[in-house]
Structure formats: C-alpha cells, structure tokens
C-alpha cells in the first residue's frame, strides 16, 4: 500500500448518479492501514468519505475495508460548516486470501468496495447530503440530477462475456464407462480422460465487476443468501454437489469418474456446458475453500427470492456459468 493511487468510484448512490473522487491520505505505520478520503473545495468536509484498507502482509492474509461517510448536518450556503455536527454511516468487510496480494485479488477488493457502497445506510448518507454541502462543494446547490430508474423488465439471461476466461481447474472427458451400475452403486462410473485447458466465453471482470450483471434485476444484492457477492452470481456449493442425489437426479449433470492409472482415484465431476467438459468437485473444494461453482439464478416463478433450500437449485433455475477461484468474504 506504499504506492497509493487516487480512486474514482462512479455510478453509486440510489440512482447510480453519484461519483466520489478519493485521494490517498497515507499509511499508518503502526498498523499498516491505508486511508483514502474525498477531497473537496470545503476543508471542513474534506474527510466526508473515508475508506480504510488493511493490506495483507506475508504474515497477515486479510484485507479489511471500512467505509465511513460523515454527512454534515450543519452547513450554510456560504460553505461554512461545523464538522463536529454530523451523522455517520459505516460498512466494512474482511477478505481472507490464500496467498499474497495479486492483481485479481486487488480487483476483487475494488469490486466489493463498490458493493459496500450499495449498502442502504451508505446510500442514504450519499444521497441525502445537506443541500448546503452541494452548494459549497459542487456550486449548483442541487446535488446530482435524477436519472431514469432501473429497467422494470430486465433480460432473463446475464450479459454475454466480453472475452474469455480459462478454467482454473483441470478438465476432463467422461464419455466412456469404466464400470456400469451394479448392486454396489446405482450409477455408472466413467473413465476420466484429462483434456487440454479450455476457455469460458466470459472474462473474470464480468464475474467480479460487470455493473450490467451486478444486481441485474434488483434481486441479487451484496447480502443475498448463498454466497451472492452482489455481482449477479451464486456459489453453487461444490460440497453439496458431491452428494449421491446429484448422481441419480437430473438437477445438475454430475458423474463419478476414475482418474487415469492403476491407482487413479474415483471422484465426482460436474459438467460445464460452456466448455463441454467436466471438472472435479474434489479439486474445487480442495483449493483452500476458494473454488467457486458459479450459477446464475433466473427462476421467474420464485418472485425474485433465492431459496434457502439448496435442493431447489437445478440447471434450469440456476445454470452453471463457470468455475472460478476468488477469496471468500
């Protein structure tokens, strides 16, 4: 965090029409916490928005991001304010990583920081600023102008990918039967033949930061059940997919396969339609608990509610989009 850079967060607030320009305020040498604040024309309001980021070191593998918004309630049109008379809103999130910071991890921090700013308390603090603040800081006395609301009839499918993303796990073909169903198991076991890496028609940015996909229909928000990260996707829980019921049902295409060699293990694999191949559920769950099977909830009959019962998920209501590796929140 020694090389802090200015950050511009746009498209925030209830109507997505507020922009915050955050400038570095230095790093606390005691705890390594870096702070960025909004700089404005009014000195008393210069720290109206403060974002603190605790960078992981080799011995501390957590990010902690805290957003603090102080909304001045005592300001005049001339720009004089009493900074002690404020109401504040806070939100924070801690990330756990499996290794030292990477570009992808930093991208996730930026994405989830934006998701934090969608918190209702912070939206209220952003949108309901004292009018005198807008007069002093923006010079127009009115704050941001309103923009059209969300699409009342959003598309059922997520936006198409803007590029390609390589599957981070080994992929397999399970087309030939190794051992047919018998008295010991009621499902076929297949030969697992490893394939060359393949790409999804989607980029990592689409999964972590596509604002057209994020909260695409007003339902999938930062705090929604079952691992939705506010980006319009859901962690389908690779551990649950390994249960016997998924081998015998048609909810998701899960097969049991034997890896190559005399001592090759028998594992369970999930089919990834986007690349026409299978991925080992054991590989996903073993990756420091950071492997994620990505599904996209699209069941209109639910009225927008994501079910609490994982057994209600299937390939029609929540088709698999990809598998990725991201730090869990």
Curated annotation (Swiss-Prot):
<feature type="compositionally biased region" description="Pro residues">
    <location>
        <begin position="145"/>
        <end position="161"/>
    </location>
</feature>
<keyword id="KW-0946">Virion</keyword>
<dbReference type="Pfam" id="PF01819">
    <property type="entry name" value="Levi_coat"/>
</dbReference>
<keyword id="KW-0167">Capsid protein</keyword>
<dbReference type="Pfam" id="PF16814">
    <property type="entry name" value="Read-through"/>
</dbReference>
<feature type="region of interest" description="Disordered">
    <location>
        <begin position="143"/>
        <end position="162"/>
    </location>
</feature>
<protein>
    <recommendedName>
        <fullName>Minor capsid protein A1</fullName>
    </recommendedName>
</protein>
<dbReference type="InterPro" id="IPR031819">
    <property type="entry name" value="Read-through_dom"/>
</dbReference>
<dbReference type="GO" id="GO:0005198">
    <property type="term" value="F:structural molecule activity"/>
</dbReference>
<dbReference type="InterPro" id="IPR002703">
    <property type="entry name" value="Levivir_coat"/>
</dbReference>
<dbReference type="InterPro" id="IPR015954">
    <property type="entry name" value="Phage_RNA-type_capsid"/>
</dbReference>
<dbReference type="GO" id="GO:0019028">
    <property type="term" value="C:viral capsid"/>
</dbReference>
<comment type="function">
    <text>Minor capsid protein.</text>
</comment>
<keyword id="KW-1159">RNA suppression of termination</keyword>
